[in-house]
């Protein structure tokens, strides 16, 4: 009788993530578990089929072999464990191990995998990024099962040596002239079999869980900075070390300031009269308002530097500056008296535009010369 497609057994697609495959397995395993279906041979057969499919599709090597060769690529009956095939494994293990510098691993047991690293995207306001703070983060992860202490075996039981690979975690497959080693499909490369799996983690040794961490964000962080929290990633397989958590920082746009490295920039509107006559204006900083002296005859677009009013570097602790660009605003909603005063002022400039507006005079001289050259 031909076997069903493993992806069909679990009801997943070929591009489904490992986490989703695990979710599908747990859902089906709970449904067809023999403890929930006592005496039901069909349910027992389905449970075995589901477990077999899960073991293949969550092992990267076996999954790759299955995707390429189908059931033939993961069927241990197509290989062997005795006779001269062990010699082939020794020969090729020695030769290729010496060539590639890895040393011969032979039939050594596969080590339980380290936990996966996790990434958390953290968005901060500019004020939070500049000043630093402590954030409470809720992290979905895989944690060691507290019922079986991460062993995967039912409480009071333990794993037994795999009869297929005899505890080695690897078997040999014959492919023509070559004998190739691969992870044992029976024990998933561990060298041990869990006959009585834990009812909580279903033999995985890990369960999905959310945990809350207090993370200190240093002052001066910026978009693209990454904070590493060692050991706060997913739990490792069956007691292996956990992964790490990486907090990826991004800073929201600010209504007033823009940031470039450790410097801050802002635009400050000033009136026509203030630009012409000079005076003091108030400008915003992250520490509050400060006074800025505007010289007489200040042109729009002029930049003023306030030293030490920028951001303290998270690495060197040097402090940047605040650069204020003044922008002269044209007055609006004028009454008749104000308009008349401006007309009188404009009249006093007649014939003296070069004296009072040197940039404009230079501009119009350039335009005049342009058309003269164009028509010559």
From Swiss-Prot:
Record-level GO cellular component terms: cytoplasm
Keyword Disulfide bond: no
A Pfam family it matches: DnaJ
UniProt-annotated binding residues for Zn(2+) 2: 162, 165, 184, 187
Principal location listed in the UniProt entry: cytoplasm
Compartmental location: Cytoplasm
InterPro entries in UniProt: DnaJ (IPR012724), DnaJ_C (IPR002939), DnaJ_domain (IPR001623), DnaJ_domain_CS (IPR018253), HSP40/DnaJ_pept-bd (IPR008971), HSP_DnaJ_Cys-rich_dom (IPR001305), HSP_DnaJ_Cys-rich_dom_sf (IPR036410), J_dom_sf (IPR036869)
Zinc-finger ranges (CR-type): 132-210
CXXCXGXG motif repeats: 145-152, 162-169, 184-191, 198-205
Record-listed Zn(2+) 1 binding positions: 145, 148, 198, 201
UniProt record similarity statement: Belongs to the DnaJ family.
Domain comment quoted from the record: The J domain is necessary and sufficient to stimulate DnaK ATPase activity. Zinc center 1 plays an important role in the autonomous, DnaK-independent chaperone activity of DnaJ. Zinc center 2 is essential for interaction with DnaK and for DnaJ activity.
Full protein name: Chaperone protein DnaJ
Natural source organism: Shewanella frigidimarina (strain NCIMB 400)
Annotated gene: dnaJ
């Amino acid at each position: 009788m031909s076997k069903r497609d493993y992806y069909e057994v679990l009801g997943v697609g070929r591009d489904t993530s490992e986490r989703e495959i695990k979710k599908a397995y747990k859902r089906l395993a709970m449904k067809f578990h023999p403890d929930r279906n006592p005496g039901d041979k069909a349910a027992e057969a389905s449970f075995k089929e589901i477990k077999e499919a899960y073991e293949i599709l969550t092992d990267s090597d076996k999954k790759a072999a299955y995707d390429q060769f189908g059931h033939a690529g993961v069927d241990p009956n197509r290989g062997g464990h005795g006779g001269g095939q062990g010699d082939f494994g020794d020969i090729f293990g020695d030769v290729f191990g010496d060539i590639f510098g890895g040393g011969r691993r032979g039939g050594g047991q596969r080590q339980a995998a380290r936990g996966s690293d996790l990434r958390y995207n953290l968005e901060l306001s500019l004020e939070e990024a500049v000043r630093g703070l402590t954030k409470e983060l809720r992290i979905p992860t895989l944690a060691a099962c507290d019922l079986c202490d991460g062993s995967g075996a039912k409480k009071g039981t333990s794993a037994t040596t795999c009869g297929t690979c005899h505890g080695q975690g690897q078997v040999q497959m014959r492919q023509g002239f070559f004998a190739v080693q691969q992870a044992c499909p029976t024990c998933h490369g561990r060298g041990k079999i869990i006959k009585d799996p834990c009812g909580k983690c279903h033999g995985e040794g890990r369960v999905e869980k959310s945990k809350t961490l207090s993370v200190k964000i240093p002052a001066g962080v910026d978009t693209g900075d990454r904070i590493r929290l060692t050991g706060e990633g997913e739990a490792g397989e069956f007691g292996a070390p956990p992964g790490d958590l990486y907090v990826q920082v991004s800073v929201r746009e600010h209504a007033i300031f823009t940031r470039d490295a450790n410097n801050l920039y802002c635009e400050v509107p000033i009136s026509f009269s203030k630009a012409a006559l000079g005076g003091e204006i108030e400008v915003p900083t992250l520490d509050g308002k400060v006074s800025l002296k505007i010289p007489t005859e200040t042109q729009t677009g002029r930049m003023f530097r306030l030293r030490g009013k920028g951001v303290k570097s998270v690495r060197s602790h040097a402090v940047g500056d605040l650069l204020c660009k003044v922008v002269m605003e044209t007055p609006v909603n004028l009454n008749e008296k104000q308009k008349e005063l401006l007309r009188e002022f404009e009249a006093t400039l007649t014939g003296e535009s070069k004296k009072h507006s040197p940039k404009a005079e230079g501009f119009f001289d350039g335009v005049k010369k342009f058309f003269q050259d164009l028509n010559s």
